[in-house]
């Protein structure tokens, strides 16, 4: 489960990450990554580690399918954030904001496929 301090909650912040952040995609999802520079315009949520949020629209499937995809993606993000906390060279910085947007292909994807897609997109974004 994604820890509360790592959740992205504000709709305004979701919009900012999607608009200002860099993005990379795969067949199953699109990852938006935004790492703001500290300063007067920076969001207040810059402490407590990276924050992540999900966008799973009706295009993915009915409510049961959307919730299943959300659970899988939340678990993937929690794993990545936990591993980054102990890694020598983490993919996500302390001030990073990540939004993962699920595409219709994610409904048929396994957890391993989703995890590899998220990791691949994040590695391409953090270059």
Swiss-Prot record:
Keywords per UniProt: Endonuclease, Hydrolase, Nuclease, RNA-binding, tRNA processing
Xref: SUPFAM superfamilies: Ribosomal protein S5 domain 2-like (SSF54211)
GO annotation terms (biological process): tRNA 5'-leader removal
Any one GO CC term of the record: ribonuclease P complex
Record-linked InterPro entries: Ribosomal_Su5_D2-typ_SF, Ribsml_uS5_D2-typ_fold_subgr, RNase_P
Claim: Flavoprotein is one of the keywords in the record: no
Domain of life: Bacteria
The EC number(s) this enzyme carries: 3.1.26.5
Gene Ontology molecular function terms on file: 3'-tRNA processing endoribonuclease activity; ribonuclease P activity; tRNA binding
Reaction equations catalysed: Endonucleolytic cleavage of RNA, removing 5'-extranucleotides from tRNA precursor
Enzyme class: hydrolase
Subunit description: Consists of a catalytic RNA component (M1 or rnpB) and a protein subunit.
PANTHER family named in the record: RIBONUCLEASE P PROTEIN COMPONENT
Function summary: RNaseP catalyzes the removal of the 5'-leader sequence from pre-tRNA to produce the mature 5'-terminus. It can also cleave other RNA substrates such as 4.5S RNA. The protein component plays an auxiliary but essential role in vivo by binding to the 5'-leader sequence and broadening the substrate specificity of the ribozyme.
Family: Belongs to the RnpA family.
Name used for this protein in its record: Ribonuclease P protein component
Species the sequence originates in: Corynebacterium urealyticum (strain ATCC 43042 / DSM 7109)
Source species taxonomy: Bacteria, Bacillati, Actinomycetota, Actinomycetes, Mycobacteriales
Gene encoding the protein: rnpA
